[in-house]
Amino acid sequence: MSQGAKVRRPGCDLPLPVVRALRKLGQDIRDARRRRRIPVAVAAERASISKTTWLKVEKGDPGVLAGTYAKVLFVLGLVEKIAQLADPANDSVGLRLEEERLPRRIRHKKGKPSGGL
């Protein structure tokens, strides 16, 4: 590597709200593991990851693969939460935008049969 080259750390260009959300996720994972009284070594073994990687997850490290976070949540019995993350039913912004695009009035064209009774 040349002298002027910089090594970019994963996550250094993430927006602050993303960094905070990952840290909170890591803390929540740590709390869940501790409530279950599972030692880090045992939890990491169950997730087929190293103890070091598990600790990175608990710190909310953005360099850890999303699949690793999913395995950790599976080990803790929380994997069903992943499916709800971007569920359209919980997307208040998307639902509001969709509602704004709905037509105010619906008119039937003359001469064509309507789809109703």
Task: Please describe what each predicted stretch is.
Residues 1-8:
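Intrinsically disordered, low-complexity and often Lys/Arg-enriched segments
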Residues 10-35, 83:
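A short, Lys/Arg-rich alpha-helix, primarily the initiator
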Residues 29, 40, 66-69:
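Helix-turn-helix DNA-binding elements, focusing on the entry/boundary residues of the two helices
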Residues 37-55:
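Short alpha-helical DNA-recognition segment
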Residues 50, 61, 76, 89-90:
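The DNA-recognition helices of helix-turn-helix-type DNA-binding domains
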Residues 61-75:
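Short, basic-rich loop-to-helix N-cap that marks the start of a DNA-contacting helix
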Residues 83-117:
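Short, charged recognition helix plus adjacent turn
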